[in-house]
Every structure is written in structure tokens, then in C-alpha cells.
Amino acid sequence: MAEGGGCRERPDAETQKSELGALMRTTLQRGAQWYLIDSRWFKQWKKYVGFGSWDMYNVGEHNLFPGPIDNSGLFSDPESQTLKEHLIDELDYVLVPTEAWNKLLNWYGCVEGQQPIVRKVVEHGLFVKHCKVEVYLLELKLCENSDPTNVLSCHFSKADTIATIEKEMRKLFNIPAEREARLWNKYMSNTYEQLSKLDNTVQDAGLYLGQVLVIEPQNEDGTWPRQTLQSKSSTAPSRNFTTSPKSSASPYSSVSDSLIANGDSTSTCGMHSSGVSRGGSGFSASYNCQEPPSSHIQPGLCGLGNLGNTCFMNSALQCLSNTAPLTDYFLKDEYEAEINRDNPLGMKGEIAEAYAELIKQMWSGRDAHVAPRMFKTQVGRFAPQFSGYQQQDSQELLAFLLDGLHEDLNRVKKKPYLELKDANGRPDVVVAKEAWENHRLRNDSVIVDTFHGLFKSTLVCPECAKVSVTFDPFCYLTLPLPLKKDRVMEVFLVPADPHCRPTQYRVTVPLMGAVSDLCEALSRLSGIAAENMVVADVYNHRFHKIFQMDEGLNHIMPRDDIFVYEVCSTSVDGSECVTLPVYFRERKSRPSSTSSASALYGQPLLLSVPKHKLTLESLYQAVCDRISRYVKQPLPDEFGSSPLEPGACNGSRNSCEGEDEEEMEHQEEGKEQLSETEGSGEDEPGSDPSETTQKKIKGQPCPKRLFTFSLVNSYGTADINSLAADGKLLKLNSRSTLAMDWDSETRSLYYDEQESEAYEKHVSMLQPQKKKKTTVALRDCIELFTTMETLGEHDPWYCPNCKKHQQATKKSDLWSLPKILVVHLKRFSYNRYWRDKLDTVVEFPIRGLNMSEFVCNLSARPYVYDLIAVSNHYGAMGVGHYTAYAKNKLNGKWYYFDDSNVSLASEDQIVTKAAYVLFYQRRDDEFYKTPSLSSSGSSDGGTRPSSSQQGLGDDEACSMDTN
């Protein structure tokens, strides 16, 4: 399955398109196998057969032939074929079902040595089942009980069973099948769970990335090395979630120990409280800590272990944990009387219970950090998007959690049907009150009490001037950031002068500009005319894409390797030139397989040559001149004649006689047939690359050439024809692609690898980038949010007067604000081609945030807020790391939460470009009646920061201008 190539029979383009099109509509089924294909290869195949394209003019052209399936771009390590991290579906790879893969493999083959990337379909969700392909397998750490230092890594699907893991561990640690053994799930440093239900899947068991599993073989006398531990676990109460209220104890025994000697254990922290048996998934929900209990741990200063890319969850949880009204509600067990198990929109109270258990553990004062493993598993059951171990968005997790807690704790048991009324010119106060009361009739929970506010939206029809006013509840405020107007790109300029190295430039271009803008910017720095530039994306030693001048720069991703080539439209004598893509290929000695016998290397060329006066000899000379900086020419006496001797044939070492051939026509004219190497760029088994030509030639001596030419497809993976060696003119155009074929010996002798990769750095790369204003005030973001806008053509409003959709004007305003105001800074922006994160520093006040001026309800109460928490994101979109700053409600001090680590923080650390979600608490009358934070009697004797540290007096409400 892994290899392919050779001369292959394949149906015509229309048949391929039809057969694959039907298969690509296959629905995901649990347990089915799907295959990953590099999206670049797949896009090339789509061009070749005209898949999903209205332009059928170039369908079937040989230069578009994709060659064998090549997934090398998906691997971080070509040898182990380990997938790169953070690959994105459709952008980096496409998924095809088994039958589609088999057809493509049969038609095109696969690059030599590459194994298929096959993955299983797994199912997520408790009520609504959701299937997805598990692209990244779960890495587990495996060890044997008697030697815990010998840890081996293995990858498993979440659909694999515990029995599958046991079988693999027996093989790894040489444990016979007839010998009894037990599996233990080890987390933190001293907590073990027995995995006794072998038919459970990895997903059912809640195993996570990097989880340590221990296999314990039975002693010869029938006892178990950990027997004492098991005995203790059978008497210790544990918090278990079981599948029904009447279920028996979980099959997973939870054990805590810190010292194991001769089968004995010393129990340390393993805190267990009364059991919770309502709902659940059949595993222990204990949150056991690493350190022994300590009376010196400040409640709330509890870190959360990273279970594998779960920092986004930890960040959101720390912010919510330090939201005093919500945390007090759970610590006082007020939630127990309000759990709504019958709400069809809820999760039977299980999310509320899981969250309550975690909050109680975090505020117990006994644990320095806990592993929120069971909480994450519960979340993943109801929200499949969070079930894996890929990086997610802390704000999206926060939105799900607030909504889930609300529905689990909704005091409304039966939601009434309400008919919405139009404002019809009624006063805003009346319409807003009606909207809020209607909202509370269906939604009444601690989340609504604490987090919900009211928007006012005004829409005006541009045609009939109809005004529509609505009031809608919100749980968090998403604020846009002023968009960057430009972007910085780093590109390589390849000059036409063959003696000059490529130069790397850093240029500033319009964010939504065109390729021509890039060329103009580069022209200003280099002095080369923009019209003489061609911009290309180089990938795996080939041109992935050659851009047109009017194409948008949003098609170019930040990670693309962009080369800009200086080309000529006319030659020195004024004749018309054509620019040809030229690849370096090494012909390798063929193994017995039928896979490709050549490999691309080096940086490809864009070569300008005469369009109407080109012979093989002049082409060879032009290429030799172009690569003379890093390719030395053989001396005449090395081969007995000059390498440029007139009449030399294409690549022959022996005597030859040029055959009479017709002038070569370009492949699109249909006069050439594919050579026998069409499918993979191969020769007949056992042949020398040059022998193909030698079969046709006899007679006069012919010198050695450094390389031979082949006309190839645009990927350089399939030969179309050899070039005529009879001295006649070549007919090539801009759609032609050439390959220089080298043998290994010649390449090692004459090709300077180091010099070929060498480049210069322009001063623009050496100078520090000019820092434009990178800060905005929070008030600027709010003003942008409340600015009137015109709806886009794809997002129109239906006007009831005009009876049609209109691009109305829309204005959003704030009508009422909640006790806890959650502000989401919209840092991430993306479209089909472009993904970006705005690293703008948003200046937000730590205290005294006065929102009153932005509330359009003139009779509203004062809205003054103090910051209590911040969720931070470091890095780029889809990757990076999440942390949190939060203010402890007991001692008034700020702390930095970085997964399991908690450290004291100062206020001047909080406002950074990483701030992503802000939590503000409203100043209410009752807020000031509480005991002062400095006298809270905290264990560390913390005091509230002084006004000099704060920059503002405690009671001084500032406007949002922080300058």
C-alpha cells in the first residue's frame, strides 16, 4: 500500500472526478478508517482533473499531472514520519475515506518509503453523537510496576480499548498472556487508579496525553505487589460518577500513596469526600494532589495540572474560580437545591456537579495543585470539540461552561412559550423591561443573576427608513480591536545576475493588498523594477504556486517560503523571452520496487530564455550560466571533450547519432505522448537514466553533461518527454516545466550544497522594526463596538416593510450591565486564506472602570467596575499558551496562574498584549459593606495594594482613558 508508481492505468479525468466526488461525500462512521493526504498534492490533483472547477480548459494537461501521492509536507521528521503539530484540516491536509484512498493509490501510487497516514473515526458526545477523524493519536507513557523508571511511549486511538493497551504492554514488557496482570492509571506522583474494565475505550477511561500507565504482573504465589494498596482503596470512600443513581461502585479503584516498599504503602493526601452517584461516566472523580496536605496553602491558590494542551481550560477555570459571587454559591452548596436534571437543554446537572467538586477542591486549602482530569472528561462528553488534546480557545470554553452551568442550574423547570413583540415606536424603557422580563421567564439561574446584561440593537432600512429596535441578553461582551492596516513580510529576492546570492528582505505591505504591492515595496528597497518580478511560493524544492500580480496577499500565509525572482520579458537583442520553471532532480539507483527513482533538491529556478530561438544547446548554456555560482563546470580533459562541444546530445556518454525528429511541440498541443515513466518519473527497471537516450543514438563521440533535461509536470514528479537533441529549435512556453536530472556522483562532485543555500540579509532584516503605536485604550474598543455599521451583502436584514433583505445600518448599544462583566478582546481574525492574531496592547484599568458613559439607558445606576481576573494567551492563532492573573477574594492580592504553578504577581504585570478575556466586578453597595480585604485574616497576612501601587485611589472612579 505504501509504494506506487510505474506505468499505471487510470481512467480519464471525468471518470476520476466522478468517482472521487461520490466517495468524498461519504459520511463518517464510528470505527471507519480515513486517510490524510497533503492538501497541496490534492489541490494539484483537483487542477489536473478539473475537480470543483468551472474552468475545464486545462484539464488533463501533462504539466498539471500530480505524480505519486506525496505527504512529506505533513511530517516533522521524514524518517519517523511523525506528523507536524497543529495541522489544520483542509488547509494542511484533506481527509479521504478508504475507498477513495485506494483509488488514488491505484491511479497515482505513493512516494517511495512513505506509509499511508490512516486514522480511525471516533465518536463523541453523550446525547448528540458526533463523529470525527482522530488525526492525532494519544501518546501514553507505559511502564512495568517493578521498574517505574523504564518508561516507553506508545500512541493509541481514543477508540482503542484497555484490553488493546494491555496486550501491547504485555508485548513490550515480556509478560506472558497466561500470567495474570493488572493495569493502573498513575497520575500526579502518588495516585493510582485500577483500570479493571478492559472493554472500556481510552476515551471512556479519560486517559490523557502523557498519561502514565503501569502494568502489575501477579506474583508467583498469587499475591499482588500492590495488594496492600488495593485493600486500602476498598475501604476508603471515593467520589465516583456512575452511569446511574442505582449503579454500584466504579470499576476504577482510586488509591493514593507516596511510598511503596515490599507491597506496603503510606497514604498521603488523597482527599475523598462523600460519594456523588448521580449521572456520570463510570470512573473515579477524585482530584488527588501531589504534596501532602498543608495548612499553609491559601484557599484558592490551587494550580491546575496540564493534561495535554489543556492550558486554555485551566486559564478559564482560574478566572471563574476567582469570581467571588459564583464561587461562594458553590462553596455554600446553594447549587444543590437548584440543579435542574430535567432540562432538555442542560446536562442533567453533571457539569454543575463536576464544576462544584473541582471548585471545592481548589478552595479547600489542602492542595497546591490538582489535576482536573474528570472535569475535562465530563466537558468532553457534552462538548465534543473539547474532548481531544488539541489547543482550544479559553473564551470558547468559557462560553460553553457558562451556558452549561446556566442550563444545569436553571430555576425554570418548564419554559413558557413567549411571542416576541416589535417595539413599534414604544419607549425604550418599556421595550427593554419587557425583553428582560421575558428573558427571566425562561432563564433564571445564578449565571443570569451574575453575568447577564442587555444589548440594544437598532436597524434602519436604507430604502424605506423602517427602524427596528430590539433588546437582547448577553453573557459576555466581545469587543473588536482596531485592525492592523498592514503586515510585515519576509521574502527572498533572487536577482537575475547569476553571481549574486539571493537576498532576504523585510517589507511592509497593505494587509489586504495585492501581490503587486509586495513587488512595489520590494522594488523600492532593491532598485529592481516591479514589472520584472515574479512571486512564488517554494515548497519541497518545487513551486507550489506562482502568483499573478493581481492576486491578494491574503493567499500568502505567514509560514510560506516566498521567493521573488527577477526575470526578463525581452532578451538583449530585443527578442521575446519566456520564463521557465526549472527543478533540480537527482536520479537515484532504483530499488526493486516500482516507486519513484528521482528526488527533487535545491532551490528551483525561474529562467528567462528566448522564446523563438531556443535550442537544447543554448538552453543548457543558459542554465549553466544561471547556476555557475554554486555549480562548477568539469574540465575538458575530465571527459576528453568540452561539455559544451557543439553537436553534443542530450545526456549521452557514448557515441551517438542524432535522429531525425520533428520540432518539439508543447504538450498542450497534444502531439506528444507520455513517456513510460509518466506516473512516477521512472525509467524501465534496471536501466541507467542516460540509457533511454542512448538507445536512439549511435556514431560520433559525445561529451559528458552535468545533467540532462526532462519536460515534467508542474510538480516535477512525472516525466512528460525528453527534449529533442537534434539541434532544432525547441518550442516551449510559460506553461512548460523542466527538470535538470543529475546522477548522485555528478551532484556530489560539482554541486556546492552550502553555496546553493547561501543568501545575504538586506539592511531591512538587520534593523529593528519600527514600532508603530501598538496600544489602544479599552474605551476605543467599546466605541468601535458601538459604531454604526452597514451590514454586508452576505449578512442582510429582512425588512418587514419592504418584504425583502436589505443591507441595513446597524448600531449596537449597552442598555444594562451585569455584576460580573466579562470582556472578550477579539484578538483572532481569520478567513479562508488568512489567520492572524492581533498583538495590540489594550490599556485597561485595574480599578475604577467607569462604564456609565457607554450605557444608553439614562436612568441606569452607576456602572463602576474593578478588575478581578484576566485570561492571557501567548503565541499565535491555534498554538501558544494560556495563563491567568486573578485577585484572591480573601487577601486582595494578585496571583499568576500558569497551569499547576501559582505565584504572587504585581499589578504592573497585568496589562500586556497577551490579555485576552477580562473579568470585572461591579461596585455595589453590598460590596463596600463586606469586611476590608486587608483584615480578612488570610494565612499569608496579605494586604491590599496601596494607592501608590495602584496609581488611583481605591474609591476614585476613572474614565476609561488610562493615559
From Swiss-Prot:
The gene is USP4. Residues 384-386 are annotated as: Regulates ubiquitin dissociation. This is Ubiquitin carboxyl-terminal hydrolase 4. It catalyses: Thiol-dependent hydrolysis of ester, thioester, amide, peptide and isopeptide bonds formed by the C-terminal Gly of ubiquitin (a 76-residue protein attached to proteins as an intracellular targeting signal). It comes from Pongo abelii. Belongs to the peptidase C19 family. USP4 subfamily. The modification Phosphoserine is found at S445, S655, S675, S680. Its main location: cytoplasm. Residues 142-226, 483-571 form the Ubiquitin-like domain. A motif (Nuclear localization signal) lies at residues 767-772. Phosphorylated at Ser-445 by PKB/AKT1 in response to EGF stimulus, promoting its ability deubiquitinate RHEB. Monoubiquitinated by TRIM21. Ubiquitination does not lead to its proteasomal degradation. Autodeubiquitinated.
